[in-house]
């Protein structure tokens, strides 16, 4: 029996062949994706870095920063990528059976080893593989020492993702930041300029029964996306809807502030989202273990005594913010601060800051996110015609206004700030100079501005800091009959109480919100 002079491939070589073929599939997918779409997210996995593109393409690449030039790579010729024989410098192109260059846009080459020990390639399982030849036309021996890793690193920065190849080349793609990668919500925090995307197919976090909405939003003809208002001109731009993916894209510029972005159908609001542009909020663990955000929802900062610490106002159970402002208003000039402090999109004249003496439905509130509702006769000073105690809850709901990972707190979250309706020396302290309250636990201190509130009767801002001290009113998620509980504090008084977390009030008031961790 004649003996084959060529030994069979080792297990190590067979594994290299398998790894190389898997890498070639990934490389082809990447080469196509970077030219057609943006990177939506990056994630470290056990198998490598998973890149998700906005068109839905997902690729996982295994990287080796120390890897050298591989057996096969890619290079640009004209306006297209072609497969290369990386070991060859003068004639780098990997050739097909007819001797022509092989475009990356075509079939993926499948690499193997023939029974004589040479590298082979084919593009179809039904086609007999041919030997890979070097620049002199000689077959390339599969020694087992070849480098088969194709990716050196994946790095993101300045709005781009750079994928370094081991053959010295680079694939580059624009990157958008996926705001909903950690979960969907009615508010998203943005801390740097750039292009962003979020999932517009889900209302809020998609949870909570009895809130009056279906969690899912079905894309339909006539749908678009746009901004409705911003308190910093040019803060958001390029708002657009991809009806295929159901994603909303937007560009955030320099500065800090707030904006409301909406999914529209035939000029009417289907759902809206609060884009909150601020330094990345920090957290503080209170004495009872509740983890709070370090600022009011919608605030640009945390400066004691500074208006940057003022957040937005919210009617209880509604997800959409009402502009805060820095001055007290009267019923005659209610929302003057909002009109002077924000830019409203002129493309939608029916959508502007307004007060309505009539109650509405949850659908009506969602369709008119800039209208402050109150029916003081028919509903017990509620904005909702049929009061609903499930719109917010200690389990985050679809209508909760906080960003992913946060929710409106329960009233018990503030229990260690209070003793007998009074401040606690060294723990919760009224600051009469900066008009607000500090809460200290351990080495951390939180600032609560006395930001007042929007009155139920007109929507006017009242209770802001003044010579009489001002007051703070912060909603909780808990309810009492047709009212809801809130945290209230004011200048230190000898009687009648200075701070209380067990007061309940009509849900049509516009109070501030301090989000806590879910």
What would you call each of these model-derived segments?
Residues 1-179:
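Collagen/collagen-like triple-helix sequence repeat recognition
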Residues 49, 81, 117, 161, ...:
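Residue-level detector of short, conserved catalytic/binding motifs and their immediate flanks
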Residues 51, 163, 282-287, 434-444:
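Short acidic-hydrophobic surface loop/beta-edge motif
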Residues 81-89, 120-128, 165, 269-274, ...:
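Short, well-ordered strand-loop elements centered on a beta-strand within folded domains, enriched
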Residues 124, 165-168, 175-396, 480, ...:
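Short, compositionally biased
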Residues 170, 299, 378-518:
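C-terminal, surface-exposed recognition/capping segments
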